[in-house]
């Protein structure tokens, strides 16, 4: 039963993962994101009071 011999299957598994790990990450990391994070001010803004006409 050749299916039980792990030597060729293990080599194919390791080689395929090696190819995936060398080809896919540069393609994924090469994308640019449209929404770049911006630094926000740490100062808290004072809320403006609402001028409601109370009748």
UniProtKB/Swiss-Prot annotation:
Q: What does the UniProt keyword field contain?
A: ATP synthesis, CF(0), Hydrogen ion transport, Ion transport, Membrane, Mitochondrion, Transmembrane, Transmembrane helix, Transport
Where, per UniProt, does this protein localize?
A: Mitochondrion membrane
InterPro entries linked = ATP8_metazoa, ATPase_protein_8
Annotated region Disordered: the residues are 34-55
- One Pfam match: ATP-synt_8
A Gene Ontology biological process in which this protein takes part is: proton motive force-driven ATP synthesis
- Primary location: mitochondrion
The topology of this chain with respect to the membrane is: Single-pass membrane protein
One GO MF term on file is:
proton transmembrane transporter activity
Task: Kindly list the residue ranges recorded as spanning the membrane.
Answer: 4-24
Residues in a coiled coil are none
One GO CC term on file: mitochondrial membrane
Q: What does this protein do?
A: Subunit 8, of the mitochondrial membrane ATP synthase complex (F(1)F(0) ATP synthase or Complex V) that produces ATP from ADP in the presence of a proton gradient across the membrane which is generated by electron transport complexes of the respiratory chain. ATP synthase complex consist of a soluble F(1) head domain - the catalytic core - and a membrane F(1) domain - the membrane proton channel. These two domains are linked by a central stalk rotating inside the F(1) region and a stationary peripheral stalk.
Q: Name the family.
A: Belongs to the ATPase protein 8 family.
What PANTHER family does the entry give? ATP SYNTHASE PROTEIN 8
> What is its quaternary makeup?
Component of the ATP synthase complex composed at least of ATP5F1A/subunit alpha, ATP5F1B/subunit beta, ATP5MC1/subunit c (homooctomer), MT-ATP6/subunit a, MT-ATP8/subunit 8, ATP5ME/subunit e, ATP5MF/subunit f, ATP5MG/subunit g, ATP5MK/subunit k, ATP5MJ/subunit j, ATP5F1C/subunit gamma, ATP5F1D/subunit delta, ATP5F1E/subunit epsilon, ATP5PF/subunit F6, ATP5PB/subunit b, ATP5PD/subunit d, ATP5PO/subunit OSCP.
User: What is the name of this protein?
Assistant: ATP synthase F(0) complex subunit 8
Q: Taxonomic lineage of this organism?
A: Eukaryota, Metazoa, Chordata, Craniata, Vertebrata
